[in-house]
UniProtKB/Swiss-Prot annotation:
Superkingdom of source: Eukaryota
Name under which the protein is recorded: Protein disulfide-isomerase TMX3
InterPro entries: PDI_TMX3 (IPR052250), Thioredoxin-like_sf (IPR036249), Thioredoxin_CS (IPR017937), Thioredoxin_domain (IPR013766)
Enzyme class, UniProt record, top EC level: isomerase
Gene: TMX3
Topology within the bilayer: Single-pass membrane protein
Top-level taxonomy: Eukaryota, Metazoa, Chordata, Craniata, Vertebrata
GO molecular function: protein disulfide isomerase activity
Amino acid sequence: MAAWKSWAALRLCATVVLLDMVVCKGFVEDLDESFKENRNDDIWLVDFYAPWCGHCKKLEPIWNEVGLEMKSIGSPVKVGKMDATSYSSIASEFGVRGYPTIKLLKGDLAYNHRGPRTKDDIIEFAHRVSGALIRPLPSQQMFEHMQKRHRVFFVYIGGESPLKEKYIDAASELIVYTYFFSASEEVVPEYVTLKEMPAVLVFKDETYFVYDEYEDGDLSSWINRERFQNYLAMDGFLLYELGDTGKLVALAVIDEKNTSVEHTRLKSIIQEVARDYRDLFHRDFQFGHMDGNDYINTLLMDELTVPTVVVLNTSNQQYFLLDRQIKNVEDMVQFINNILDGTVEAQGGDSILQRLKRIVFDAKSTIVSIFKSSPLMGCFLFGLPLGVISIMCYGIYTADTDGGYIEERYEVSKSENENQEQIEESKEQQEPSSGGSVVPTVQEPKDVLEKKKD
């Protein structure tokens, strides 16, 4: 009886899971060649995938959840997916170069999703890009609501101006990353002080910063640098994104599961420097911490001890390490100042030698990872080709040896035949020319074997 109940419960769970999958898939449309003509009437969030792609298969259940969520909240954005290998011409038209590629298509515009492939991040991307490029903030209440909702956002304050045109151009390029708003001076909170109008501000880290054209340069570049919070929990994707900012990244490499004083102290030091020395370093540095050293070891092609502090230049793959332990904030500030004035020598880089080293390191890492994960598979992948190559080399070597031996035997045989012919010709010349005369025979010279017999 108990076994029957367990079996019934298992069947019920399986049925629920299957129904959930069917329901989720029902809100994601499979797109074909007709999509090209019919898409302009709606806003589409599309996953361009390949059936053989492993990352695409991992994304599939997340994508089904995105479709269900967008439908349940009444979003005007339709969710679909397209096999880019079957409809390669359409995929090429939208600039698909890898799999999976997530794009939001709005009219003639196509926006790439470049963030993490989680349900929340994809939905946030769809909401941000599908709406207005510049969203108005008509009241202080709305302004305060946006501050609570978004960790980082930009605001243009003022009327029509050349600065606003630059702001719109920057927003059209960077809307895939962050939010852009506009407001009047009356709507801005009282704690905000503006020296001149119009102005562009970024609100983040519980404060604000004003764009200065003379100090900050190009507006788009400034927005691209300031779209990150000053302190971040880093991963490989964020480090890649920070490469476009031109900033150095000061990282505390720690083990978050380790609660020892040494690990928590380094993290606190980086946080304190990011907070208290922002005015000095925020133009040149991004601060954060990373859990574990696996990614950093791959990036640096070296084994870093944990915990430690490393400063990365993600634009050219250089890095800076201190030859002594950082014990307090003053040590970290001194380390940063030494980097800025060139006292600390950079390591790594993207020179030809480093690129060759990278190729060797990547090949070694791949081989080691294969043997660690599956020794039998590693033996098969690398042992079989080596065995085939060894057999081929042996065959070529033995073929050359046999050929030389046969050629040598042929020359010896040819020489023996010529000698035999000469002996026979000599005998014919020594035979008597007439039948009755007796001619004394001349003894032929003996060869070596005959002499030995005598």
